[in-house]
């Protein structure tokens, strides 16, 4: 597997971030940077679930459509969505119109609306491993798809009635939200926001 490679500006990046401008911007400014706040984490949780079985680029390019369709991923607003809203979502070409994923998003919002402020943030971040125990990956082959922490997080979320989040999706969430820094050792973005 490949290590960091130079982008057009000559600075080394994770290879996956070089394929499109959308990926490059996401790689450089978002992925692996700490995300906090229940609504912000709910958005990432939902988008990671919608990505399941698809490319992340598909989700990135529809992210604004998702934000519009799901009331900016404000938990309290999505929790109030009705059957008419669900039908609207199923007809919205700006998002992924997968009934199971839409149902899970609406059900998850209803569950999370009953949690206290900051509870989702605290729960997710409680699974962040100690960075000192994780060596910087040198190649993409060194980056896991699942870890004991992501497996435990997925199990905990499921126990709390959060749907459509298995260990792989939980690990992708951990990567995207900065719980782990899986930028390659030589990548210019490694350590960003820490």
Language-model regions: role of each:
Residues 1-194:
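HhH-family (HhH-GPD) DNA N-glycosylase catalytic core used in base-excision repair
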């Amino acid at each position: 597997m490949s290590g960091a490679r130079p982008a057009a500006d000559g600075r080394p990046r994770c290879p996956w971030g070089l394929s499109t401008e959308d990926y490059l911007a996401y790689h450089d400014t978002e992925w692996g940077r700490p995300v906090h706040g229940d609504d912000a984490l709910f958005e990432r949780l939902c988008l990671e679930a919608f990505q399941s079985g698809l490319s992340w680029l598909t989700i990135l390019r529809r992210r604004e459509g998702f934000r519009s369709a799901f009331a900016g991923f404000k938990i309290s607003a999505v929790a109030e969505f009705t059957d008419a809203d669900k039908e609207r979502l199923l007809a919205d070409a700006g998002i992924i119109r997968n009934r199971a994923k839409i149902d899970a998003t609406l059900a998850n919002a209803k569950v999370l609306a009953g949690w206290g402020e900051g509870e989702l943030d605290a729960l997710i971040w409680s699974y962040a491993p100690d960075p000192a125990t994780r060596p910087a990956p040198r190649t993409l082959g060194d980056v896991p798809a699942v870890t004991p922490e992501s497996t435990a997080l997925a199990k905990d979320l499921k126990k709390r009635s959060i749907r459509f989040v298995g260990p792989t999706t939980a690990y992708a969430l951990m990567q995207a939200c900065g719980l782990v820094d899986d930028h390659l050792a030589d990548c210019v973005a490694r350590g960003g926001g820490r």
